[in-house]
Amino acid sequence: MKICIWCTKIFDLGGTKRVVTLLANELVKEHDVTIMVYEDRFKEDRNMYHMSEDIKVDFIDNDFFVNRHHTPAFCWRYLVRKLNNKWGIFNHEKLNSVLADAIFPQKTQDKWVEYLNEQDYDIIITTASLSLRLGMLAPRLKAKTIGWQHNCFDGYLKVPNVVFWKQEALLQEYLPKLDRYIVLSDYDKRDYKKILGIVTEVKINPRSFVSEKKCDPEAKRFLMATRFVYAKGLDLMMEAFEKFCREDDEWQLDIIGSGDLWNEIVADAKRRHIEDRVNFVGYTNEPEKYYLNSSVFLLPSRWEGWPMVIMEAFEFGLPVIAFHTGAMDLIIDDRKTGFLPEAFDVDKFAQAMLKLAHDDELRRKMSRNAIWKSEDFAIEKAVSEWNHLFEELMRRGEFYEQNKKAILQCRYKYQMRTTCAEYVKEYPVEEKTILYEAFGGRGMICNPYAIFKYLMSKEMYRDYKHIWIIDDYLDNGEEIEKYKKYPNVKFVKYKSKEYCKAISTAKYLINNVSFPSYFAKRKEQVYLNTWHGTPFKYMGFDIQGAGVAQGNTAENLLNADYIVSSGSYMTKTAYENSYKLKNIYEGVVLEEGFPRNDAFFRNNREETLGKLHRCGINLENDKKIILYAPTWRGEKYSTPETEMETIYELIRTVRENIDSTKYQLIIKLHQIVYYHMKEHQAETDSEYNIFVPATIDTNELLAITDVLISDYSSVFYDFLNTDRPVLFYHPDKDNFEHNRGLYFEEENLPGPVAADKETLGGFLQNISRAVEPYQERYRQIKSQSCLWDDGHACERIAAAVFEGTKPENPVFFNKTAKIKILAYAGNFENIDQADNFDEFLKSVDMERFDITLIGTGAENEKTAQKLEELSKKIRVLYWKPSYPATDEEYVCHDRFMKSESQDVPEMLEDFYSREFGRLTGKSQFDYVAIFTERKEFFPVMSKKIQVKRIFTGDNWREILKL
């Protein structure tokens, strides 16, 4: 692309010039880049910011565009500008034409339009005040137009006689004419929208370099790198440093830079008798040595946009002290990577300096945090986002106009799908970034939480970034607050736009259930599925009539690089048989035990009791804890039964039969049930305030439990690590087994089973006697399901996933001599194709072939029934049209499917490849068999599948000869 960056000057000191040069240096590697300037009073000096020789610099003769003769019109425009700057007289929508002409005369505009169109640029970017002028020209330019803000909203609109002072009405008319207006922070985005009604897009400035060398945290030197102008607050700095020097006689202050206020500030230092402590360096081409010889960076600015010097300071490991103005709190994490004293309070600024200067450990800690934080501002991320914007503008201009209605429908109907696809296609994978999700964002719990805590405790993983997916920020407030101080821990709202970005760009993905159907794993990503329990009740395709509902989970497991298993029983029951991964799963099953069970080998009793207390559950230390932890009931996981009377009846039974001087009861409902009854619980009597929130980890709770009462939940397997009693309460056994199914008969359980409350009450009256006959069975099941639980599961799994260490107990499912067939038979509405497929299944030798059917149309009752009736010897992957695709791909795919063409358009090849991967993971098939002649999604997509041959309904019998 041919890109022009238009600014007033470039070979001059200042953050804008620096970041423009930085971006241009990267863009010129892929594009033709010109920097156009017309007020640069300096000669060309590419060494100032190491400008690439490949960048063209176009020095504009401004006199060609502007008539500076003192004609009446010139004098009138001058008067209009002065009156408006003083009183805002012309800052009104009805007078926009007058003020616009005064700022940018029509004849001047005409010359600029002619000149810019002659250059044949694809994209024109303007900085600062020139964005308004570009907005005036935009409708007549051939190029796409982008305005680029380099200061905060207040710095542009609220500082007298600067940039857009008293020009709000002009901004409201002309900025929307730009194709994009870029701001530096979410605060600016909010203010432009709220105050001016202008839609903007955020792109932060990147760091300008990467340094292997870091500062010396022991150095007793402060550093400023700045321009000597009013906005930078050097007068405030002198006042604060004078106060600092009264309490300290060692630290020095180096100030790099120059400017109009140089003499004034130097004189101020002498007047305050601190000139021997301040080193006025002036301009330098070697700022690195000053960063390396300092340990704290100071920024007392009155206003800032997104200061480059902060990113530079972080890269060298310098914590930053800055006044809390603008977007500073989005860059500096207060008390983690620096301090943010109240704006312009020099006393608090001096106090922050003293605190960092006199606390060596705090300075070292903040230095490490600053280095971590620097990763957020990598130039690669910024360039990728800019390139994505360029491609979007160029690609979508014509395409959008031609397909506007269809695109808007896609964005409205498929917002999450299109957003995910955009991030997958356009954004790079972020190395050393780990995403954790448990039960759809319920909280920091289960196996993902155990792995997170392990990684956070190890020095070797200190430079990793951690992203936690959270559904309810209020419920998880305590944990969020706890980790706020860690700059490498971030929380993202479940099913938000940021969530789409996170699951699409994080290098490592850890989930204990499954990601949504619009998730498409990339080849560069590493997916660890930890699952969340050893099977007791039926799961996966073993559940009668639940095949369709299990489709997304099966797809997630097939996409996982690693799946965690508690042992051989779980591997065979859950993964090999229930989800039918045998023969086609290309990842590794890690039989290393559940990470969450490491909690049984740690003594965290007081910490867990503290969490319960803060939730309003006050347990007595001298009493044993009985925990009731039932599973969920109902036909659908998303809408479980929430009838509480059965729970309350159990509470009464327990309390009536236990010795209340020795025992106390708490209840941990299943994650999904708790969220559905949370509001109901709030209305119950306080005596029932024993329900443990879903945000508290179950295994932390089990570790302090003395007696477990379970039903059909798999938590009892984990609890066996404690060697403490477990009782089972099955008042609805026949109904539950009929609707769901169980892998274990009651007589094989490691504890007594009560079918009614009276029997349960009897067990509770003498627990020791009740469990005595089950001791041998208890030990047998424990040896089977807890074989690898030794307190080191997290360590083994982390070594395999993050270090590439060979797993200690790997299981592979892809070793088979069977011929693997991937079949498609449509929705079975066509009788001929349905008969063909039935005949195929009857004819094929299941001992020689492994058959996977892509099931579609399952939302149709008859089709769903047909799929359920198929032989259990074949594997059905249920495909639903919830695929992630860009709006362009949606529209092009729809157009292609309606056409008579059979040749897949090149622009859809990536989409079809992604969708096949989403459905089958890394599974490898030998042949494809398609039993329909209709032009449907899978037959079209199958043309891009790498197999030996594709058979059809006409020649499928040849498969039998293989």
Feature locations, PLM:
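Conserved donor-binding/catalytic core segment of Leloir-type glycosyltransferases
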Residues: 4, 182, 215-232, 238-241, ...
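Membrane-proximal helix-turn-helix segments that form the acceptor-binding/catalytic region
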Residues: 110-117, 162-181, 498-500, 548-563, ...
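Donor nucleotide-sugar binding/catalytic pocket of nucleotide-sugar-dependent glycosyltransferases
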Residues: 144-147, 154, 170-211, 584-598, ...
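Conserved catalytic-core segment of nucleotide-activated headgroup transferases in glycan assembly
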Residues: 230-257, 446-452, 595-679, 833-837
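Aromatic "clamp/platform" in nucleotide-sugar-dependent glycosyltransferases that forms part
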Residues: 283, 302
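Short hydrophobic beta-strand element within catalytic cores of glycosyltransferases
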Residues: 310, 319-322, 332, 708-709, ...
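Conserved acidic donor-binding segment of nucleotide-sugar-dependent glycosyltransferases
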Residues: 334-335, 339-346, 355-360, 752-756
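A short, well-ordered alpha-helix in the C-terminal region of glycosyltransferases
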Residues: 348, 355, 362-376, 384-388, ...
